[in-house]
């Protein structure tokens, strides 16, 4: 697991998006004190990542 800080939002669970040449799919979400954190599946490497808009 690692964190990617980026600028995007408005994704629902199940939505896919492209970031740094990889396709991600949002599989869960929760609101933290300092912002919104999404858990995603990174298809190309088949690993979970935390994606945190800043």
Where are the regions that the model predicts?
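Intrinsically disordered, low-complexity, charged/polar segments
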Residues: 1, 40-54
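Intrinsic disorder/low-complexity segments, especially N-terminal tails and targeting/processing regions
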Residues: 6, 20, 51-53
